[in-house]
Amino acid sequence: MVKNSPISVIPQEEKRGSVEFQVFNFTNKIERLTSHLELHRRDYLSQRGLRKILGKRQRLLVYLSKKNRVRYRELIGQLGIREPKTG
């Protein structure tokens, strides 16, 4: 599995507490858990953890889309995240 470096996705001056950095970290965790669950389909605790991380990332993305729509669109484009359905 190839990991994206935070430097290529997020500018150097961004802090670790920024919404973009947190979304990036959650995306890496989601990718790792997804590859783990492909091998271990019945690992229900990991499935639950994956759902929790997905929810956290979704809440952060909603927050970012309300605060700064341009940065939101750039981030989902760089990370390859689909835009959520509305309605």
Swiss-Prot record:
Q: Mainly localized where?
A: plastid
Tell me, what's a Pfam family for it? Ribosomal_S15
Keywords of the record: Chloroplast, Plastid, Ribonucleoprotein, Ribosomal protein
Q: Where are the transmembrane segments?
A: none
Q: So which domain of life are we looking at?
A: Eukaryota
- Listed GO cellular component terms? chloroplast; ribonucleoprotein complex; ribosome
Instruction: List the GO biological process terms.
Output: translation
UniProt subcellular location = Plastid, Chloroplast
Record bears the keyword NADP: no
For whether the record's keyword set contains Ribosomal protein, the answer is yes
A GO term for molecular function: structural constituent of ribosome
| InterPro entries in UniProt | Ribosomal_uS15 (IPR000589), Ribosomal_uS15_bac-type (IPR005290), uS15_NS1_RNA-bd_sf (IPR009068)
Could you tell me which NCBIfam families the record lists for this protein? S15_bact
The subunit structure is: Part of the 30S ribosomal subunit.
Entry's family note:
Belongs to the universal ribosomal protein uS15 family.
This chain belongs to the protein called: Small ribosomal subunit protein uS15c
> What species does this protein belong to?
Nymphaea alba (White water-lily)
* Gene that specifies this protein: rps15
